[in-house]
Amino acid sequence: MTGGIPKANSYERIISLVNSDELNKILFNFFKTLTRNLNPEIKLRNFDGRVNNGSKRNTTVINEKKSPLNCLNCYDNEYGYCIETVPIDEKTNEIPTIENLINGMNLKGIISTWDALNTQTKNVKAVINAGGDYIIPIKGNQENFYNDLKLYFDSKKCEEIIAGNSNSVYYSESEKSHSAFIKYEYFQTSDISWYPNLSDWEGLHSFGLVKKTITKKVKVKNERKNAKKKMIEKTVTAIEYRYYISSKQVNIKEFSIATRQHWAVENKIHWHLDFTFRQDNNTTTNKKALLNLEIIHKFVLAVLSKAKPTYKKSLKLIRKHLSNNFEEFLPELFCYLMLN
């Protein structure tokens, strides 16, 4: 450039002028031309919020307090892409934002998932009105409902379901994660007529429980006097219970996939924004520029994720490899995406 390389402020100013909705549509449509969909067993849309902590400012002598950019993200497992990035108003939270987002969607044939904060009757109704289904958690924010489900899925009821209760189904699977052995047990039932506020939850057809048992060996201090080994191995077991409601009829395989894959938005989007792109290190307070940069990062993340099987490297190393000679490697990358 005749005037030299633009400064960071110039890039920030230019990026902030771009319409965020149009940018997201253009990048998503371009991504769809480059690659095929993933043909998942079930179609899911995972909703979750993420805060860009780098944009936060506390009140000081030279700064006034500024809240961070908080975005609601929607990850579509059919494409492996974050199809929506919506800024959350500072004066509210995710709950009304997710309702407004769902109202503009066609969810036919798609199961929606989110965390317990968004389990509200209005959001459930919005999903049903959009032609979709939901498998969502119940926690302390719906305290009475949560306690009712805890009482229903007691140890006796779980034993009955494992034994083959006609209204209920059971499924289990195990995996090894690092040094831990994890067992997942899934319980699902259509026995919901006992619940007194059934009519409040649009389209409700089943209740579910996920019991997660984590067993691992840890090193602890040897309490025996004059022991030769100061540290000894001890087996520790932890059990987690998660309760769910669903508009779907009983289908235990579908239930297990939906509850496990909800975390895709955290593992495949949020984690990489934090650690692969180091987005929290960006301290700009220009929220429009930061929002557009996040949309661009998600497009790049989707492209790199598709290319990962070829390069057999971490996404961070693939970024570094491509940046060494971007003009040479870009056509190669796009050719691979179109062929696979």
Regions found by a protein language model. Name each.
Residues 1-60:
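Active-site- or DNA-interface-adjacent structural scaffold in DNA-acting proteins
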Residues 7, 44-51, 80, 98, ...:
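Short, conserved catalytic/metal-binding motifs centered on acidic residues
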Residues 53-56, 78-84, 91-95, 119-123, ...:
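Short, well-ordered, mixed-charge alpha-helical segments that flank or form enzyme active sites
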Residues 62-109:
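Electropositive, glycine- and tryptophan-enriched low-complexity nucleic-acid-binding patches
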Residues 89, 95, 99-143:
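Domain-level cores of phosphate- or acyl-group-handling catalytic modules
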Residues 140, 144-256:
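An anionic, glycine-rich sequence signature occurring as long contiguous blocks
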Residues 162, 272-340:
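A short, flexible helix-boundary coil/loop motif
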Residues 245, 249-283:
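Short amphipathic alpha-helical "interface-anchor" segments enriched in bulky aromatics
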